[in-house]
Each structure stands twice: as structure tokens, then as C-alpha cells.
Amino acid sequence: MRDFRNSLRTLLKQPLFSGIVILTFALGIGANTAVFSVINAVMLRPLPFRAPNDLVSIALYDMKEGIEPPTDSSAVSYPDFVDWRAQNHVFESMAVYVNRSLTLTDGAAATHLQGEAVSAALFPLLGVQPIIGRAFLADEDEPGHRVAMLSYGLWQRQFGGDTGVVGKSITLGGEKFQVVGVMPARFSFPIGDFPPEIWTTLSILRATRDGSRPMTEERGNDFLKCIARLKPNMPIQQAQANMDTITAALRKQYPDSDANLGMKLWPLITAMVADAHPALVMLCAMAGCVLLVGCVNVANLLLARSLSRQRELSIRAALGAGRWQIVKQLLIESALLGAGGGLAGLLFATWGLDALKALLPPRIPRINEISPDIHVLVFTAFVSLLVGALAGLLPAWRASHPNLANSLNDTSRGSSESARGRRTRAVFVVVEIVLALVLLASAALLGESFLRLQQVRPGFDSASITTARVALPESTYPKPAQAAEFVRKLLANVTTLPGVNSAAAAWWIPLSGSEITFNFDVQERPLPKSEQPIAQVNVVTHDYFKTLRANVVRGRDFTPRDDASAPRVAIVSEGFVKQFFPGEDPIGKRITPNGSAEPGDPPVREIVGVVNDIHLISLRDAPKPQIYVPHEQFAIQSVMILVRSHDDPRFVGAALRDAVNEIDKDVPVYRVRPLSDYVSQSVAQPRLNALLVGLFALIALLLAAAGVFGVMSYSVTQRTQEIGIRFALGAQRGDVMRLIVSQGMRLVVIGVAFGFAGIFALTRLLQSLLFGIGATDLTTMLGVTIILGLIAFVACWLPAMRASQVDPIIALRNE
């Protein structure tokens, strides 16, 4: 306790020094605490389910591609799922689920609900029970059952928390569903950017109103997500081997649909964070670099401070203080500084987390759970003590070995620095330069990558377009002709609104992150279904390309005459033509998109036009081959409406709701937002990477510059008498300035050389995050080297200016 009080008293006597060290620590610790808070919530915090480590996601991939599947859960057909469930001996249970939005029409206005159709086994598999009511029963997956489970938020918002709602019927999509339970407040599954508000069983998928074959009977129609719970003590490798055997048997048994399917098991948490994982790892590494720069900077400051205290420490040693006592005293001081930096860093991180959450892409799971918890506090405390100890260890050890004779005889200054001390401080400066260069290069590469991504032409003009989704209840609009008639009336009403230039409808809009792909056949060269190529398919109305300002480069656009009674037609993208009709005129070619949503045998469609490529998923990836079909010939109940108008999107959204209500008040309008938001969202992750790494690089650059300035300033102070002698012997001011600057820039050059090696080592980490630029781009490397060199030169030049103004008489007076 006495050592603690003495250390605290010593630090309080030097508030400027203590404040600089605490601020330096706080910048590094704050950056790491903020990043760790995200990693803790997204990746490390256990999922809120029973034995979450036993939960796995099952992903399918095309074996023809020869690559592993992405780690986010892909889809499976219901017949394949049934076979997996029956034949495996490694899972305790399995379940599937799929997004199934519903419309609640019991209130004054139709309300869109984010819903999921799930296996009855899902909730027991997750180990979560409703807070009131019961879970789904196994037989409620069968056709004819209409039961629903409410989320806690929907229960409170729509039903006022009335416990009597359990057992009552509500109207969803024009049908009566019995509410059987309410889930806990913190429960959400699947975990994502659109949390479910209501769950129904698979029974709603296993029957159709028009008598067509339901999707759940079509092997090869992969639309369900699949998870499973491993049996106790079952290694995932053994489960993988068992499922590989089953999948191989299915490939032989069903060659038309399963011939090329492979299957991969992933831990559920791994699958959930797959998209965010590379960026989070990179941010963690960059934040660690900032902390290391700060640590080295503080070590340099403590080393200089210990040298100025050599006389004090020598007196202590002469009076009987042992080396351990001196080391302990100095380590306590550095630990206190680290603790102060930790508290300030935690405050910085808390302030910055709200801004960080606003910048994070919405597709990153569990964003709302990001907050400092006990794990974050423990991490901050550990890092604070660790950096305090690391920064103070070498200075403390060096200070505990004083030369008593020199220290006690020196009455003019605390002590002169040894050659070993100068080398140590030089090494610290080199390390700071290396880390600063690595961070600067990373920030420049990510920034250039982001700029190039923004320059990608998406194939459409998003300005002044408002989008919204309209979902028609299947009970009211069971037939395609009814859906087509509704959309036709709606667009006719919308196009007459003031300020509206054009309007259209589509299955999916560009850069929404969603797609539908169909196998298709070319009439002139038919192939077995397992060998048929795949293309993105979109269902659009005749003004779709006009509204997007996309260009029909060959042939014609769709017209109102392309209705259900007209010959079946299609428009394809330029990429489609390049891949499947190279050197040929595609107009008049006949293709057959094998879409399961189309009743009966899929019709042959004649290609009547070619449109420019449109980025449907992301700007980063090249557009896939695309097929467009007229909505009148392939009418669907859920469409996105696009309205080109210079009015505020809020006004357009309100006018669109009024137009829908004029036709049918039980049809909801939701997700009203500008198309430009989707474009911005598609580059949210690269933008975040560039911003955060740029901020970290700026901090590291300032700390490195401060380190160079501090070392050179201290060197000038230590060499004052030497400089005075040089002046006395005839040296000019320019000579002294060149001496000091060259000494500092020599360290910078060494740091840059090692920094390039560090940049090349980071190539693998950065490459997956870059677009249109290599991780070792020489122009970028040269640019950041020049920037770092100029700032380091200024940091050397300022002490050199002070050295050139030394008065030789004053400098030599003590000699």
C-alpha cells in the first residue's frame, strides 16, 4: 500500500507527463475495447439457446464448382431434408425454416408481419419454450393445421400483452390461425436484420389453393434453411462423415435433382457470422497495431523519464533499496498509468459504440446486443494492466541498474544516456514506424478499394426512385390473373400521381441482396436437368427498365401486349448473351426457365431483347446471367414497386399506400425506402472498413510522429554540450540541423524497410477485403511512404531547429 501511495504521489507531481501517457494508452485501449465489444457480441457471446455448441447449420454446394460452400446457411429441398432426418444417426433432431411474411388483417389497417414458416421441432431443438401457451406439436406440420406463435414484441404491440390471446384466432393472409403461444422477450430466430414477429408451421407450405404441386414435394427446389442438434458428445467430423454417406446415396438415387450436390456442416455461430468474420479479424488486427504503437510510445516516454530520475533512484539504491523494490515501484507507476488509460479508453469506447453500431451493415447479426458487459470490462482491465506492465517493464529494469558513481557525481543533469539506451529508444522508434506504415498502407488500400467500388456502374440510375414491397394475401388473390390485375391497376393509379415520371413492379430490385435462380434449357441444345446452366430470374412489368433507366441494347422492351394470352417472351442480359450465345444473335432464340413457381410444364420463351447487365446482389461481384420475364405472364403475389419521382420518399410512400388502399385495404405496403439506400447499403461494409482502419491509421501516425519528435527532442537535450562544442569548433547551423535530421530519418528509413515486409505479410488478410486493387499495389505503397516520410521529417526538423539555436557559451558553461 505504501508503494501504491508513493507511486500515485509521484505521478500527481507530474500531471503533464501522466496526462500524455494516459491519453496515449486511452487511444489504443479505447480502439481495442470498441472492436472487442463488437466481436464479443457477434462472435464470442454464446447463442441464447440450449447447448449452443451442439447446433450446426447444414449448407449445400454445387460439386461442379469444386469449392467449399459459403458458411452462411444455404437452402435444401423438403424431400432431401426428410431423407436426411430419417437416415442420419448423428443428430438429436433437425429442423428447417424459411421466411414467410404474412399480413395481419384483424385491425383497422392491414399490418405486414415478418414471419417464418418452421418445423414444429424447431423450438424444442433450440431448447426454448414459450412464456405462455405451448410449442408446436409434431403433427401440426401436416397440411390443414393453421397455428401461430407470436413474438414478445408483437404480443405487446398488437395485443397489449393480453394473455387471453392464446387459443384465439387471428387472420393472417385471409386465413384464420390459432395462436398457441408467445415466445420470450429476448428470443429471435433466425437471428438477422429482420427479426421474425410470428412463426407458423410448415403446413402453410404443404398445400396450394390452385391445386398445383406444393414446393415441399419438389426435390431440387432448394428453398429451406436447415439446422440440426448433434447428439451429446458427437464430434462434428463424425456427423459430417455420416451426412456425406447419405448425400452420396441421394446423388445416385435422384440424379436429376441431386447429382451435383455436396453438403457441409458448420457450427451455427460460424455460419451466422460468416460474412462479417474477415472484416472483424482485420479490424482486430489493426486495433492491436494501434495499441502496440501506443505501448511502444509510452515505453519510450518512461525510458526517458527513468533516465531523468537516475539520481533519485541511485540515492535510493545507496540507502539500501534493492533492485526488486525499485522495479516494483516503477511497475506500480506504469500499472497506474495503464489503469488510468483503461478507464479513459473505456469511456472513449462507450462513446464510440453508438456511432460504430450505426455504421455497421445491418446484415451483421446481433448488432443490438453490442454493449459493454462483464466480458468487455474484464478485457479492458486485462489489457490495461498488460500494456502498463509491458510498457514499463524494460524502463523499470534499466532504471534498476544505475551507475551509482556517475549518477551521484553528476550535479548538472540527471545522467547522460548510454549507447545501449540510445539503441533501445531507436528500436522503439523503428517499431512505431513499421506499425504506422502497415496501418497507413492498409487504410490507403481499403480506401482506394472503396472508391473503386463506388465507381462501379450498377447498370441503373437509383436517383429519385422510391421502392416498397406489396404482398397480396394468397387467400384473396390465389390465381396469377388476379395478382396481375391488381398490379396493373396499382401501377395505372401510381403513374397518374403528381410528380411521378414512371412506375414499375418487380420480383426483386437491384442490390437488395436477394435473388432467385432457375435452371434453364436452350431449345436448340437441350441438356439433362442436372447439367443445365443457372441464371438469375426476375419478374418485371413493362416499364421496369424505363424506370431504372437501364438500356435495352438489342431487340425490344416488354410492352402491355406481353400478357397471359400472348406468346411467352423473355429479355436477357448482355452477360447472358456473352456466356451462352457468344458471337450469335440471341433475338429469336428459345429458352425454357425451369422455375418451380410456374404451374405445369414451364413454357418455352422467345428472347425478344437484350438489356445491359444489372448488379442484383452486390457491386463487388460481376453480374450473373439474367433472364427477365413479364409479370403478366408469370404473375406473383409479392412484388417490389419502383416509383421514379422527385418528391420526398415519405410522400411517395404515403401516396403509394393510398393507391393500394383504394384497391384493397387489406394489402400492406412496407419497407418503403429510396433505391439509393440499397446502393449505399451494398457498400456499407467496405465503407466501414475504410473509415475504421483510416481512423486507426491516423492515431498510429500521430503517435509515431510524437514518438519520433520525442526521441529527437530528447537526443537534442542530451547532446546540448556536444552541439555547443561543434558550434565552438566552427560548425554552421545547417550542419547541426542536417546531423539531427539525418539521425532521425535514418530510423525512419529502417522502419519503412521493415514496414514493407509487414505489408506483404498482411496480403492474405487484406486481399479478400479489397476490390479492384492488389494488396501490394506499388503506387499506394509509394504514396503512404511519402506521407509518412514527410510527417517524420517535420518531427525531426522541429528538434533540429531547436538544436541549431543552441548558444555555445551556455551549452559549455557547465564544462
For the regions a protein language model found, what residue spans apply to each?
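Membrane-helix entry/capping segments
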Residues: 1-20, 109-112, 141-144, 217-224, ...
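Alpha-helical transmembrane segments of integral membrane proteins
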Residues: 1-18, 268-273, 302-328, 332, ...
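Short, strongly hydrophobic transmembrane alpha-helices
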Residues: 14-42, 46, 294-295, 339-342, ...
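Small-residue-rich transmembrane alpha-helices
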Residues: 38, 299, 335-407, 448, ...
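Interfacial "coupling" helices/loops that link adjacent transmembrane helices in transporter permeases
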Residues: 294-338, 706-748, 752, 765, ...
